[in-house]
């Protein structure tokens, strides 16, 4: 884990406590498997009330950073074993050097998942799948509009395919999905490339040609891979802000 001695940026007491604890875990000040200091000592060190600290500890425990042991010290978890994808934004903020790899993993996961569930959606309900493109003609040519349309399209296909687990994954990745989407879609050529993909997928849905889904997705990923490679090589340092 990378050492990062940046000044804490949080404003509220709860956010300050959370940032302090998370950064301390990431920098191995509180290494995995160790116990946190007592609530009293930790609250005094951070400068927050014990009530605020307790709320923060409970939230971090839900995210997998900690294990609260009643009557015993709070234990620091190995996040790679205990946490879920909902902490990805936090990881990117903690270590920008790891951000390209994490984002590349996320894009790969989306591609592999979508090949499966979009195929199922078109196969089982081509009409509902086609309806997901109802707003395509009105799609405004801006990074913000493309990012939102793209997120909703891929997410709603999980609904049509009756894949609730995939839908939850999209929910947990929404923040980072939108941030990198804005980076990708700020370029006109990227929007044009993606618009062509949408039109191809729309036609596949209209025809109910589920067998064409995987090939269409893979061709689009191949066409856009060079663009993504360039983006990941020059990620802005303020991506998580």
Curated annotation (Swiss-Prot):
Gene Ontology biological process terms, A to Z: fatty acid metabolic process; regulation of fatty acid metabolic process
GO-annotated cellular components: cytoplasm
GO MF entry, a single one: fatty-acyl-CoA binding
Keywords: Activator, Cytoplasm, DNA-binding, Fatty acid metabolism, Lipid metabolism, Repressor, Transcription, Transcription regulation
Coiled coil: none
Location in the cell: Cytoplasm
Top-level taxonomic group: Bacteria
Domain named HTH gntR-type: residues: 11-79
Start-end of DNA-binding region: 39-58
Record bears the keyword Transmembrane helix: no
InterPro entries: FA-response_TF_FadR, FadR_C, TF_FadR/GntR_C, Tscrpt_reg_HTH_GntR, WH-like_DNA-bd_sf, WH_DNA-bd_sf
Presence of keyword Transcription regulation: yes
Protein role: Multifunctional regulator of fatty acid metabolism.
Subunit comment: Homodimer.
Name of the protein: Fatty acid metabolism regulator protein
């Amino acid at each position: 884990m990378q050492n990062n001695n940046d000044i804490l940026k949080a404003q509220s007491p709860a956010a300050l406590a959370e940032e302090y604890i998370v950064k301390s875990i990431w920098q191995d000040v509180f290494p995995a498997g160790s116990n946190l200091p007592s609530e009293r000592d930790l609250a005094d060190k951070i400068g927050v009330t014990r009530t605020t600290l307790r709320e923060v500890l409970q939230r971090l425990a839900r995210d997998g950073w900690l294990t609260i042991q009643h009557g015993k010290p709070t234990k620091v978890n190995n996040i790679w074993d205990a946490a879920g994808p909902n902490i990805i934004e936090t990881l990117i903020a903690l270590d920008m050097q790891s951000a390209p790899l994490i984002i590349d993993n996320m894009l790969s996961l989306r591609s592999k998942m979508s090949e499966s569930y979009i195929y199922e959606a078109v196969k089982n309900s081509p009409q509902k799948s086609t309806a997901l493109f109802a707003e395509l003609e009105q799609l405004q040519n801006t990074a913000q509009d493309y990012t939102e349309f793209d997120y909703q399209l891929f997410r709603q296909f999980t609904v049509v395919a009756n894949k609730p687990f995939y839908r939850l994954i999209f929910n947990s990745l929404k923040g980072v999905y939108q941030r990198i989407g804005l980076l990708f879609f700020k370029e006109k050529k990227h929007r044009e490339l993606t618009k062509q993909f949408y039109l191809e997928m729309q036609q596949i849905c209209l025809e109910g040609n589920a067998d064409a889904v995987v090939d269409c997705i893979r061709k689009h990923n191949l066409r856009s891979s060079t663009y993504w490679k360039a983006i990941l090589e020059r990620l802005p340092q303020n991506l998580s802000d």
